[in-house]
Amino acid sequence: MLDMLFPAAAVLLGYVVLGITGFGSALVVVPLLAWRWPLPEVVALTLLLDVMASLLLGGLNLRQVDFAELRRLLPGMVAGALAGLWLSRSLDASWPLLVLGLYVAAVGAQALRPRPARPRPPAAAPWALAAGGAIGVVEMLFGTAGPLVVAWLSRRLPDVHALRASTPVVITVSACSVLLAMGWAGRLSQPELWTRWLALVGVAAGGVLLGHRWARHVSPAALRKLICGLLVVSGLTLIVHTLQQG
C-alpha cells in the first residue's frame, strides 16, 4: 500500500492540472511515474486514466464543447494515428520530440505576449486536416498530444471556457485511437497494468473534480495565462527530456 503513495500523489497533481486547464496531465504524470515503473507501462496507464478523466471533464462542461472542431480534426487524427503506428516502428523519436517541444513553447510564449489592438485572425478551418494529422502522429509516438491540441484550439476558439471544455474531448478521441493500437499489439494485457489502474482511477477522478471546482474561481484572463504558461513549461520539459536522452 505504501508503494502506491508516490504514484497516487503524482496522479492527483496531474489530474488537478487537467481539471483546471483541460490538458497537461500526461506531461505531469508520465515523468514522475517513470521514476518508478517502465516508460511503456506508464504511457499505457496514463492513457487509460486520461480517457476516463477527459470524459469526466468533458461531461462536466458538455454545453461548452465545440463539436464542430472535433469533426474537422477527426479525419486528420485517424490518418495521423495510422502514420504514427508506421513511424513508431521505424523512426528515432528524439528529433521530432525536440521540434514539438520548441513549437509548443513558442506558441505558449507568443500567446502570453500582450495582444495587439487588432487581434490575430483565427487559424483557417482547412488547416484542421494537417493539425489533426499532427495530433494523431504525436499521440501515437509520444502519448502527449495535449499541448498540440491546445496550440490549435487556442487559434480557433476565442472563448477560453470553450477551449478548456473542448480540449479533453479531442484528447479522448486521440487517446482511444492509440489504445486501440496498443491493444492490437498486446500492450494492454498485463494484469499489473489493470491493478494499478483500479488503484489510481479514483485518485484521478478526484483530482479532476478538485481542479474543476478551483477553475470556477479563476477569471478567463487568468485561465488563458495559466493555459499558455503550461504550454511553455510543457514545451521546455519536452526539450530538456529530449536533450537528456540524446
Go through the PLM ranges and name each one.
Residues 209-232:
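Interfacial loop-to-transmembrane junctions
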Residues 22, 38, 92, 159, ...:
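A helix-boundary/kink motif common to multi-pass secondary transporters
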Residues 31, 84-89, 151, 211-213:
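Small-residue-mediated transmembrane helix hinge/kink sites in multi-pass secondary transporters
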Residues 44-47, 100-104, 108, 168, ...:
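Residues within membrane-spanning alpha-helices of integral membrane proteins
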Residues 54-65, 85, 93, 97-124, ...:
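Transmembrane helix exit motif
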Residues 4-71, 129-137, 146-203:
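Small-residue-rich hydrophobic segments that form or flank transmembrane alpha-helices
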Residues 50, 77-81, 104, 171, ...:
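Residue-level recognition of pore/gate-forming positions within transmembrane alpha-helices
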Residues 40, 68, 94-97, 126, ...:
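Residues that define the loop-to-transmembrane-helix transition and helix capping
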